[in-house]
Amino acid sequence: MANTAQARKRARQSVERNKHNSSLRSMLRTAIKRVRQSIAAGDKAAASEVFQKATSVIDRVADKNIIHKNKAARHKSRLAAAIKALA
């Protein structure tokens, strides 16, 4: 239990940040799933379009330090390779 005003405020901020970060992580996972689904469907044009949107989401989440920049690069690289393999 937070005893000081500062500790209570930090606890409140932590809860709000957790909600926000969870939302961003969920958005990231959804974007990646959409790309994987279009790859599984075999539609290269649609996959490329969805990948472009997912790249934006991945970069945004990495910029906010929700995931590490190397993890973001790894996601983008693997998705791009999978799209390229559709040819």
Curated annotation (Swiss-Prot):
Molecular function terms, GO-annotated: small ribosomal subunit rRNA binding; structural constituent of ribosome
Listed InterPro entries: Ribosomal_bS20 (IPR002583), Ribosomal_bS20_sf (IPR036510)
Region annotated Disordered, chain positions: 1-24
Gene Ontology annotations for the cellular component aspect, listed alphabetically: cytosol; small ribosomal subunit
Sorted UniProt keywords: Ribonucleoprotein, Ribosomal protein, RNA-binding, rRNA-binding
Gene3D superfamilies: Ribosomal protein S20 (1.20.58.110)
Gene Ontology terms describing biological process: translation
Tree of life domain: Bacteria
Pfam families found in the cross-reference section: Ribosomal_S20p (PF01649)
Biological role: Binds directly to 16S ribosomal RNA.
Similarity section: Belongs to the bacterial ribosomal protein bS20 family.
Protein name as it appears in the record: Small ribosomal subunit protein bS20
Lineage, top ranks: Bacteria, Pseudomonadati, Pseudomonadota, Betaproteobacteria, Burkholderiales
